[in-house]
């Protein structure tokens, strides 16, 4: 994560699901309505992005990006793909609701998927 925070998304904050839920419990009256872990399918997405990125590397160079940039993004995409495949990193959709929520979908289609 340090590589990602330093080189890919500087200044970002990447909390774990556990940290988000703990903060929710401490600081709000929100209720967890739905949580979907989609790390395994995101690994495939990252793989496809890396393949497309590498296939267009000449276009990337033509935009003025150097070899360091190409290596950094190739590494990032491969690193995250492996992390999601091995389940050492994760990504999730989290849906929370205020009190009074009665079960209707806030995001049509989300809970039916």
Please identify what each model-predicted range represents.
Residues 1-103, 111-113:
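Substrate-binding/catalytic lobe of Class I Rossmann-like enzymes that use SAM or dcSAM, i.e.
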């Amino acid at each position: 994560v340090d590589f990602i925070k330093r080189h890919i998304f500087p200044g970002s904050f990447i909390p774990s699901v556990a940290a988000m839920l703990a903060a929710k419990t401490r600081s709000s009256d929100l209720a967890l309505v739905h949580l979907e872990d989609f790390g395994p399918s995101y690994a495939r997405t990252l793989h496809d992005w890396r393949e497309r990125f590498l296939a267009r590397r000449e276009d990337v160079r033509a935009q003025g990006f150097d070899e360091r940039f190409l290596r950094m993004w190739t590494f990032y995409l491969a690193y995250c793909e492996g992390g999601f495949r091995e389940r050492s990193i994760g990504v999730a959709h989290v849906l929370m609701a205020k009190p009074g929520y009665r079960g209707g979908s806030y995001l049509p289609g989300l809970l039916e998927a």
